[in-house]
Amino acid sequence: MASAAANNSSSAAYDAAETGGLLRRRNTTAAARGNAGEEEEEAEAVAPSVEQAFADKPVPSWREQLTVRAFVVGFLLSIMFNIIVMKLSLTTGVIPSLNVSASLLGFFLVRLWTAAIERVGFLKQPFTRQENTVIQTCVVSAYGVAFSGGFGSYLFGMSETIAKQATEANDPMNIKNPHLGWIIGFMFLVSFVGLFALVPMRKVMIVDYKLTYPSGTATAYLINGFHTPEGADLAKKQVRTLGKYFSISFLWAFFQWFYTAGDNCGFSSFPTFGLEAFKNRFYFDFSPTYVGVGMICPYIVNVSLLIGGIISWGIMWPLISKKKGSWYPETLPESSLLGLQAYKVFITIAVILGDGLYNFVKVFGYTIKGFIVMYKNKNSNTLPISDNGTPANATEEESFDDKRRNELFLKDQIPKTVAIGGYVVLAVITSGCLPLIIPQLKWYYILIAYIFAPIMAFCNAYGSGLTDWSLATTYGKLAIFVFGAWAGASHGGVLVGLAACGVMMNIVGTASDLMQDFKTGYMTLASPRSMFVSQVIGTAMGCVIAPCVFWLFYKSFNIGASDGAYPAPYTIMYRNMAILGVNGLSSLPKYCLTLCYIAFVAAFIINLIKDLVPERVAKYIPIPMAAAIPFYLGPYFAIDMFMGSVILYFWEWRNKDEAQSFGPAVASGLMCGDGLWALPQAVLSLVNVNPPLCMKFLSRAANAKVDTFLGN
């Protein structure tokens, strides 16, 4: 989200590897617009042309757009956003779009840079929207590696920590423990191939098909707005707001740390609704991060999360736990995947797969429909247009904006020999080198994946252009089942499936994200060459930064413990999907498979109903993917996010324009401050500096026992 996926896109809400992928894409358009609000509509109503407003400003060459300051700023922001995305991936997997924050902070830091240089008389090059787009692309592609790298899903799912939580395939053949060296190598091998997969198709997708790529378009409107006098003034106010809430969030996280000397200590374990509710994970944990995430995510996502938490932890799990001794053995520990934990994990997987299958069929259907329209009209000068595939006359007169954008977009060609040659060379290198890192992943598995990947990448990019949904994680899960079953359990099939997931997910997701970035560049007159180079440099940054950030978390915290601060929930789910593909379902407890079938079908049908009913009704129907996330984790973070929605709702009710302009800045500040505290917290942990206090809450009876014990 992700590769640059985390980046562009109504998923980029949220499975750090899964729901992050799909739901984030469902959310980003609204989030990426951020302060723009209804800017697209306003632009059409107020100004006849965006590009005429910039007509007196020369467009720098593609080399001039690639400045040192852009990549210095990009590097600094990449570190910050990698920390934030990594923390989100390893806690709940709910990752919102950070496009607004990246664009806003990139704009602010370079403006600060240019103002300082200008004062001493050394300013040689003004800050342009093209350079802003380069920064945006670099940052998003860098922190996208924290998502597509699978640190909260397939990659850490290979580890012994997660394998011990599963009941099968936990032998050495199916385990690969993380180490910084091989992780960086793995990232470099799998992250770049997708950049070359669809480069030859950029003219077809952007100019000929006129695909909208809503997230890319929204980001372009945002950047164009920053570089008008009015937009620059608003951006300064937004940055001040972001800085204010960043400071509040960071200081609050620092204050909380003093009270977390043991397990279940501190404000994050505050039994807001009572101790019984706390046992079922119903509480508000005072996390600024998830209040901020809730302010960015659409209302329906946050409501879906809360509904999912109530259905699972309020109804289903308490009822199933009463069947202990009947449906599963009484003696099993709570974390055993032969007991209650199996219902939590596999019913969640069933909902994710049901939702994913439906959206795969839906987006694939849109893609086929677009091709049919194009074929029918190939001799009548019409082309399918983005939103609904309806034909638009190709001979109708182009607007000034379209002429200007087409001219510059087609000016700096990326040679097809470079794109095709790059893909082939990288595919060969990866096929030869990946087995050195993961011997179970044979070279011919990788080669087969790379042969079919461009077709899947094209379908995904086309569907993403139509609907703003990237199904990269769905293609990744498909690879888990196909390659895991091919290899078999005795030949490391679980490890093969997880690694193949990474290969496929990176190619398909990165190709789609690059098209989103090309769309942003198209609308800001940034050269495709500068966009491509920025994406390559940003990805290279991410391949180093993301593993280093993960390693810091891995060495500092107990990652993967289901009851810890960093449970990495999707790691166990991805590993169990791989086990499912290799071994089947024979070991599941009683009625677990039946409930999984029901959950799978329910997710499919709810999505179908949501698309069939009128929009005024559909907007109130929960999203199954979002509802599934708290099935495993509990509803505590959903309560935080719902609070974010409540804050934003009342703000919009009081002053809608102000809320639309400053809501994303407040949310970004809350997320960035709390997220960035993880860095000094990790450093303190590494040097054995521990919190001095433990704040815990006990029932009256438990407190009396403690007093009696201490009194003796």
Curated annotation (Swiss-Prot):
Pfam families: OPT. It comes from the Eukaryota. It is a multi-pass membrane protein. GO terms for cellular component: membrane. It is found in: Membrane. The keyword Membrane applies. GO terms for molecular function: oligopeptide transmembrane transporter activity. Keywords: Membrane, Transmembrane, Transmembrane helix, Transport. InterPro entries: OPT, YSL-like. The chain crosses the membrane at residues 70-90, 93-113, 138-158, 180-200, 242-262, 300-320, 345-365, 418-438, 446-466, 478-498, 532-552, 593-613, 631-651, 666-686. Residues 25-48 are annotated as: Disordered. May be involved in the transport of nicotianamine-chelated metals. Belongs to the YSL (TC 2.A.67.2) family. This is Probable metal-nicotianamine transporter YSL11. The lineage of its organism: Eukaryota, Viridiplantae, Streptophyta, Embryophyta, Tracheophyta. The gene is YSL11.
